[in-house]
Each structure stands twice: as C-alpha cells, then as structure tokens.
C-alpha cells in the first residue's frame, strides 16, 4: 500500500463489504460532499473517498500545474489510488467533472472498473452548433474565469446558487458556497479552466465499462440534451431521468440518488 498516494489525496476507506465503490466529487468540492450518500453503501461495500490535489485536505505541495492543466492528470490520480489500494473491478461514482475523470481513467485501465455511475456528466460544456449544445457559449465561460480571478468570494456565491438551482434551499447553497470558498482560488480557477474548456466527446466511444448516467431536471450545467448525447454515444450506457432539480442531487436529493445507484448495482453488479 502506497501511503504517499493515500496521503496526497486524503484517501478514506470505510465499510466492510468485498465489493469496492469509489466516490469522486465534482469541481470545487471535496469528499465530504458525499456525506449524505456514501454511508448508505458501507454495509455491502468497501467505500473509498478521496480529495483531488488542491481540494479538501489533500497535500497542496503535490499540486503541479503541468500535471493538472487537463483532466488527464486527475484521471491518473484516480488510477494511482486504485493501485495503492489494490482495487479491481471497482464501481466508480463521479459527480459532474468527476464523472469524466473516472471515464478517462476507465479508458486507460478498464480492468480496474466494473461500472461507472455518472451524476450530471458532460463531455463538453461549450456549444458546438448545430450538432451539439453543451449549454454555454465561450464568452460565458471566459466571464466565469474572469470573475473567479477578480472576485472569488462573489463568484462562489453566484455559482453555488446557479449550480444548485434550489432557491428554496438556502442552507444547501451556503454549504456548497463554503466548499468553493475553502478551495485555493488559484488552483480552483485552473481546475475550472481544465474542466469547462475540455472536450471529451471523441473519448465516449472508447469506453468499454458499462455506465449509468443520472440526469437531473433543470440542470443548467449539464442540460438534458447533454445527457441524451452521452447516452447515444457512450457504449453500454443506461440513462435515468431524476426527479431532482439542479446539478447536485447528492446534496439536494440524497435519498433519490442512493435509490437509483442502489437499483442499478442490484441489477447489473
């Protein structure tokens, strides 16, 4: 067991089951974002939680701009953790960009993963008409990066509300906002650039691991057209429409998230 890797990514292992399930956070979040979901799987699974380098309680000294200027560096971190824990045929549950990171890892080392559960994923956030609508124009994303640089706290407030799309749930907005604010602003901006300007549409056809796509209602970050596109181009995928609104069902609707993941695992694992 490589303790250096486990320390770098602040890896936590819980549960007592034989099967392994790994939970990956989305942009700007750490492993605690899964607090309302992950414990439900501890009875039957070995649950693995981790932080991206630069987030949560990871080792900031390990951050390397060249390594993490694309999602490939984060995907390698996932593979490093799998190897450090000697994981095989692991269920990978990723939120948002975390889902794409897991997907890229599975392309490199498919034998390490049995299934992918992708919560609100998007292979490309930029519109590319007429074939593809990711939800954003380039100037919108450039504006997001500019706001992060000029007023990070203000950006965190606005972006948390936009992502959640839960105006009647201020406590959840404050929780997500605090997670954004706890991340190093420079690293967060670089991660945002790597995530929101990436285009992994051509990688979808390379995936051989079966997957479940969980599509939220009224998701501004990953709209329904994106979920359908992924399902059409991702081999061995299933698409499930959630009742949950917004982009963070594991925070706003944990019970539904647990139910849908559990149902998929019972039927396919």
UniProtKB/Swiss-Prot annotation:
Effect ascribed to mutating residue 247 to A: Loss of energy stress signaling
Cross-referenced Pfam families: Abhydrolase_1
GO molecular function: pimelyl-[acyl-carrier protein] methyl ester esterase activity
Biological processes per GO annotation: biotin biosynthetic process
InterPro entries in the record: AB_hydrolase_1, AB_hydrolase_fold
Highest rank taxon of the organism: Bacteria
Active site: 96, 219, 247
Induction remarks: Induced by entry into stationary phase, but not by carbon and energy starvation.
Role noted for this protein: Positive regulator required for energy stress activation of the sigma-B transcription factor. Could be required for RsbP phosphatase activity.
Family named by the database record: Belongs to the AB hydrolase superfamily.
PANTHER family: ESTERASE-RELATED
Full protein name: Sigma factor SigB regulation protein RsbQ
Gene (name only): rsbQ
């Amino acid at each position: 067991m490589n303790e250096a890797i486990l320390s770098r990514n602040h890896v936590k292992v819980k549960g007592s089951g034989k099967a392994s399930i790994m939970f990956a956070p989305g942009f700007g979040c750490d492993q605690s974002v899964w607090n309302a979901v992950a414990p439900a799987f501890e009875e039957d699974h070995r649950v693995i939680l981790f932080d991206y380098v630069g987030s949560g309680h990871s080792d900031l000294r390990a951050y390397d701009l060249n390594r993490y200027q694309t999602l490939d560096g984060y995907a390698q971190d996932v593979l490093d953790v799998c190897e450090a824990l000697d994981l095989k045929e692991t269920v990978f549950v990723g939120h948002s960009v975390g889902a794409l990171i897991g997907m890229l890892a599975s392309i490199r080392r498919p034998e390490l993963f049995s299934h992918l559960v992708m919560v609100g994923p998007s292979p490309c956030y930029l519109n590319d008409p007429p074939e593809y609508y990711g939800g954003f124009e380039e100037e919108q994303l450039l504006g997001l990066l500019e706001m992060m640089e000029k007023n990070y706290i203000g950006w965190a407030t606005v972006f948390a509300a936009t992502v959640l799309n839960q105006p009647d749930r201020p406590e959840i907005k404050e929780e997500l906002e605090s997670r954004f604010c706890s991340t190093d602003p420079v690293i967060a901006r670089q991660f945002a650039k790597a995530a929101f300007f990436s285009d992994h549409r051509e990688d979808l056809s390379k995936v051989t691991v079966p997957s479940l796509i969980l599509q939220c209602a009224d998701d501004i970050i990953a709209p329904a057209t994106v979920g359908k596109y992924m399902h059409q181009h991702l081999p061995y995928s299933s698409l499930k429409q959630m009742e949950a609104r917004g982009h963070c069902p594991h925070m706003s609707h944990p019970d539904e998230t647990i139910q849908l993941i559990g149902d998929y695992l019972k039927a396919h694992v």
